[in-house]
Amino acid sequence: MTRTPGFNTLAVHAGAKPDPATGARATPIYQTTSFVFDDADHAASLFGLKAFGNIYTRIMNPTQAVLEERVAALEGGTAALAVASGHAAQVIVFHNLMQPGDNFIAANKLYGGSINQFGHAFKNYGWEVRWADVNDLSTFENQIDDRTKAIFIESLANPGGVFVDIEKIGDIARKHGLPLIVDNTLASPYLVRPIEHGADIVVHSLTKFIGGHGNSIGGVIVDGGTFDWSKSGKYPMMSEPRPEYGGLVLHETFGNFAFAIAARVLGLRDLGPAISPFNAFLILTGLETLPLRMQRHCDNAASVAGWLSNHPKVAWVNYPGLPSDKNNALQKKYSPQGAGAVFTFGLKGGYEAGVKFVEALELFSHLANVGDTKSLVIHPASTTHRQLSDEQKVKAGAGPDTVRLSIGIEDVNDIVADLEQALSKV
């Protein structure tokens, strides 16, 4: 094509060509551990990073490569690395950036699993997280010191459905020479493209809207190609000679996709959380319909949120697409085509009412996931955010009365009918 493909076209075609061996139009599942070298020189070139190619599926696989190229195209990045899960993506990102004794700033509005990973598991690596309030951006800047290595936010926070001001936080990051990492899982690139708003690195749980069907686990790291890893000397993984590769300096050699290369040949190679080719295939298949699904998700969610906001047993609805929502202006700025499909609301009966309501639902599936074609529900305080203190739960938007919904693509009248019958039993 001579013209630049649109988003819908990229979702179907980016990274994929008919299989050269068989002519198969669907991307094949390359279910193999390793790949045959042409000769000794070819093998040496691959291992020395002098040529691109496949060595071992722990590091790279052709099915995985199509997925990576497609997500990078949709996000507007220079390169991507697919891994086993969203959590694995976060570990590898920070492995690229951090040394023992370093810290990073993270928004207080995050998925409960990320709060736990950052606050507990990362301590074992000597990495400190410093929590900042997305409603008071001075708390991001005030905690930065000479050992701070990054700022981490979610574009659309889980579980509260809160849009975060990426551009203003990006300004703070650039002022202090720090990369901005944005988890774009709940928005997906269909709604928000964080790199266009100042992000340097984007991560996803591919398990959610990108895969979209609740059948596969995966994660991805997208390199925005926007950060100078050599300027400050704070990021030796990219800026200093690597003894494993004969003194190669990744940023000098690979330029605006050096972060993605480091994530693959240092992080994924040594830590090992590889995505399976079959999961990569399933996620690719789901990704083709992302624009269609995401718009239906958003349209249904807007209808459901509006209906809930007028129900007498509902205390509050936290959905940025509602004109009355305090986050509505940010939603219109960053995601005018929709406010996402994951949001929370509170029941007047508190914790007990929330549990009873969840158990009364019939169409909704009660499980710990979001971004499925099917409508999903969970009571965060008793499940996903259970490990947090009461104060942390409230700050994360997971108070005792909170119910999280992930609205699917079913007939919206059926979704509302199920909510109505469950509310009648509370």
Segments and roles (model prediction):
Residues 2-61, 69-70:
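N-terminal "arm"/small-domain region of PLP-dependent enzymes with the aminotransferase-like
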Residues 2-3, 11-13, 17-20, 79-310:
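Conserved PLP-enzyme active-site core in the AAT-like
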Residues 39-91, 113-121:
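Conserved N-terminal alpha-helix of the aminotransferase class I/II PLP-enzyme fold
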Residues 52, 78, 279, 283, ...:
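Short amphipathic alpha-helical segments
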Residues 76, 147, 313-316, 363, ...:
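Glycine-centered tight turns that cap/initiate beta-strands
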Residues 119-120, 128-130, 146, 166, ...:
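PLP-dependent enzyme catalytic core of the Aspartate aminotransferase-like
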Residues 222, 344-346, 406-408:
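Short hydrophobic/aromatic beta-strand micro-patches
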Residues 271-274, 278-280, 289, 294-296, ...:
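Conserved small-domain helix->loop->beta segment predominantly found in fold-type I
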